[in-house]
Structures are given as C-alpha cells and as structure tokens.
C-alpha cells in the first residue's frame, strides 16, 4: 500500500481538504482504489458534541460516525463511502491507548507519546485502508501547532516503516500577494517548510495557494530554498468552483509526479475526466439562475451547512442552473413580521424555493415553523431536512389540524399536543456523545407518492442524526387532514418522509434523514434535484 500525507502551513483554511480530495479524484480517474483519512488534533472522540460555530458541519457516515466536514468532500470528490474510522482524533487515539493501559496490554511498560501514541496513530491509519491501493491522509491544523506534533512524528516514522517509495509528503502553503509591492512573498512558505524539515519531514511536493499565477522565478526560488524539484512546485490558484481544482492540479502535473515518486503501476496514464469536465462547465457556464432561501440558525458560519450548499450546486449543475443562496436567519422570522420579510424576498426574486436544514435547540425554532408555513401557503417549493421536517409537521398540526400549541417536547416538554417527541429508545439516555439515532437506515416509500417518484425506488437508504420523531400518536390526525406520510421505517412506526399532494402544492417534501450526505457532483440527490427543478420551473413560468 502507498501513503500520501497532506500537511498545511502558514495559515489554516487553505484548502488542504480540497487538495486531498482532488488528488484522490485524479488517482481514482486512473484506476486506483483510494482511501481517505482525516486527522483532527482535538481531544474530542468525534465531532458529534461540537458546536457548529466551533467546528462547522458534522458529516455523518453510513456506519453512524460523526465526523469532520472534510470527509464529506472526500466522499463527494472521490465518490467513495467512508466510515467513522476514517476520522482520527487525538481523543480517539488517547482513549484507545489508555484503554489498553487499563487492560494491562503494555505489560507494565511506561506509556509514552513515543512510541505508544505514535504507534497507535500508525495502526489506526493502516487499519482504514486494507482494501485499497493508496491511502491519502490529511493532517488537520498547521505545521507548528503543538497539538499536531504526535501526528507529524507518526507520519515521519511511516517513511522508515514502509519504505521511501511507499510514502509521499505534500505540503500546502500560502503565497501571500502584496498588492502595493506587486509581488508574491515566498518567505512564509520557506519558514513553514523549514519547520516541517525540523521535525524530520521533507516535502516531495509543494502546493502553493495563490491569488495570481506563479512566475518561473518564484518556482525556482521555492525549489531552491525548500529543496524540492522545480516541477514539484504546484500552483493552486483560486478557482471558480472547488470542482475545478482537480482539473487545475491535473494541468500542473501533480498526478504524474505522484505516480513517478511512488512508482505506481498504471495502464491508464490519461485520467478519465470527461464527465467531470462537463460537470464543471455546467457549473461555471450556467444557462439559468435561481435563488433558494436557507432558513437556519447558524448562518453566520456557512461551513455549518457545507453538504447542503454543495448538494444544491450538484442539482443546479444537472439543470444548467446557478443556484444562489439567500441566507435567512430563523430568528428574524419569529413574529408576525415574517410575512413582510418573506414577501419582500419574493418581490426581489430572491426566494424561488425554501430549504430548512437540521439543527438543535429552541433558539429560532418559531422562525423555522413560520418559514415552513409561508412555503406551504404560498406554493413555494420546499425541502425540509431533519428538524426541517419536524417544523413542517408542527406548522401543519397548528394551522391545518387546529392543534393549538402543538410543539416538540425538545422545545416545550409540557406541550398540549406533542406532535414531535423522543424516540422511545432515546428517552432515558443521558450521555450526549454518539448516542443519537445515527447512520444509514432503510425507509419504505409509499407507492405513487412524490418521494417514490423522485427516488424511482420502493425503498430509500439515508443517513440519520436525530433523537426525536413525529409522534406516532398523531399520525392519524395529520394524515386525515391531508399530510401524506410517504415513507416510514420498515415496521411502519417511524415517519421518514412527509409531503403534500402535488395537486395542491408543486413541491413540498421533507425527510427525517440527511440526504445531503449522499449527493455527488455528477449524481445529485433526488430531493435536491426535485427542489431545484421545481424552483426553476416556477421561475421560468413567471
């Protein structure tokens, strides 16, 4: 097996994850089996208990792993399914080592960072890629962070453990452009590489993030001072879309460098990127344009909704349509003035569809319920996800079924009509971490329903992350008043999908699941595809 390690320097949020994903895409396009790993040097076991403001989106895997959002990019770019094991945290490493110590596995030896922590890191990395040709590992954070040192030491040791021809180091760094001087500065990258070399890691490839093209002189300077080949200084200029990055890196020759350094055997030196290029072309050269309003409580940090926004991009690309996003704070829709706010957005052509994503807690919940009501009453295409489905049910119960005060017990334990309540198995759970209904579950779709037509299947398999459900005691009154429960768990007890009749509303559907985690650039998720198509049809009819 071959290993590629991606590190970052100078500043965070440089795009290490997109770089790793793009390399994975290029190598898969040449026929290699790819495995991806993200290392996060924080002390949590996983990302499940972290605030979206701290961490961004929690990406859920099929097996129920609550992971870093970069795993979402890996899955989307490389079109693979990952597991909880593909996200390694400091907490997970120490938990494993300390558990072994308590069991006596170390036979009385002094347990230390080296070799015990570093050995554990190496074993965890190796265990994820047993059925692949290449494992790509992204080290979170920036070179120089104290939290990253054990991981950097572990990947340094890999070269000795598995051989020089089986390990490659890629360093992603920033080349700041000073406008007043009119030049790119290489010194921060030089210092970053010096720091990395001080740990014992010599990068094989430099990926240089830049606003403007890199001159030959700059490449030569970086090659000299960072001790890499000139053709291994890769320009990573700002792209029009993240999906353009693999194409840019391919033009820079990064895949050929990797193949040569790792001595990879390939019968396909030219990658199959035809469909990918066509998809990128549709994104950057759209024929149409729509705006979807996302009503959320974490809109100050867009990373909290990464998979949702990317799913809209995928669906838009299929329909040659640019999907603009109007970010709407749910707290601004709490009172009756919400109608004026929404009317103004419609008037300004900024509301061709409404999407309410998942979330937790009471803050802003009334605004989400009002947004669902507005979509229902004004025939605006609507997609509700997780909490977005629960809000649609609360609105329907209050305003159609006339169950005044209907609510979720998450927000009002004494609600007169608890139309949303704990899942039975969740009621007595006190721990927060890893205890929700997590991972992939099957739903049976109602024949002839909108959900069934969108999926074009009798069953749907989606990922979940929730503690609450539509209270089964209220299924009958909801359906008697016109709500369609169009998908349920195999035993028929848990409502997985709800919708309105397409004769009364063009597109109103919601799911307890998180469909955004399964959308792919060349295979948009059916629910997002339906939302974009309905919103586009509505706009073109005006």
Curated annotation (Swiss-Prot):
GO terms for cellular component: cytosol. Residues 298-541 form the Glutamine amidotransferase type-1 domain. Gene3D superfamilies: 3.40.50.880, P-loop containing nucleotide triphosphate hydrolases (3.40.50.300). Pathway: Pyrimidine metabolism; CTP biosynthesis via de novo pathway; CTP from UDP: step 2/2. ATP binds at residues 13-18, 70, 237-239. SUPFAM superfamilies: Class I glutamine amidotransferase-like, P-loop containing nucleoside triphosphate hydrolases. L-glutamine binds at residues 53, 359, 387-390, 410, 467. Allosterically activated by GTP, when glutamine is the substrate; GTP has no effect on the reaction when ammonia is the substrate. The allosteric effector GTP functions by stabilizing the protein conformation that binds the tetrahedral intermediate(s) formed during glutamine hydrolysis. Inhibited by the product CTP, via allosteric rather than competitive inhibition. The keyword ATP-binding applies. Mg(2+) binds at residues 70, 138. HAMAP family: PyrG (MF_01227). Homotetramer. This is CTP synthase. It comes from Methanococcus aeolicus (strain ATCC BAA-1280 / DSM 17508 / OCM 812 / Nankai-3).
